[in-house]
Amino acid sequence: MRILLFSRGRLARGAEELRQLLAVLERFGFDCLLNEEFAAAIREATGREFPADKIYGERIGPQPAGTTMVCYGGDGTLLEGVHRLGGAPIPVLGINAGHLGFLTGAPNEGLDRIFGEIARGELSVQPRSMLEVRGDFAEGPHSGLALNEFTVQRHGAAMLAVETYVDGQMVA
């Protein structure tokens, strides 16, 4: 089973917590891939190196069935991890290693239990709705996905027209 580990380069936790996380993942035999920033932060904190084929970049390509993304940080880390999935149907687990964690519900303590449940297929998945935003700009059309919200920022004096659709039906 594959685990996509995601975190930002700035980590609130120390080397020992990172070693514990990696040890638990190895104990359960997960095939782990890490984003570049997380791999660099672990290397800096622990001296551990990862082979190039275990590191992914900005976007995540197709993954085998049973893949789970584990976001290690706070809510902002989880939201960025979801963004990097680009709408791929991969379950996401947030481990709260930051200061606040409304979306990252799993505590940093109890990793054996959490990853044991994943390995045994016992962790329940709660489907979440995604928001898709599309816009027509001077440089061309652009779209993006969001888990819980998006913002529109004004740049200069411009008119804004908004059409809102839910499940393909225009509602506003």
Named regions from a protein language model:
Residues I42, E80-G81, F102:
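Phosphate- and divalent-cation-binding pockets in alpha/beta enzyme and binding domains
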Residues R84-G98, F102:
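Gly/Ser-rich helix-loop-strand patches that form or flank binding pockets
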Residues G14-A15, G76-V82:
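Short glycine/serine/threonine-rich phosphate/pyrophosphate-binding segments
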Residues F6, C71-G73, G94-I95:
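Short beta-strand segments
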Residues G98-A172:
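Catalytic core of DAGKc-family lipid kinases
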Residues R19-V24, G86-G87, D167:
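Short, solvent-exposed amphipathic alpha-helical segments in soluble enzyme
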Residues R10, G74-T77, G98-L100:
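Short glycine-rich anion-binding loops that position phosphate/pyrophosphate groups of nucleotides
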Residues M1-T68, E109-S124, G135-G144:
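ATP/NTP phosphate-donor binding region
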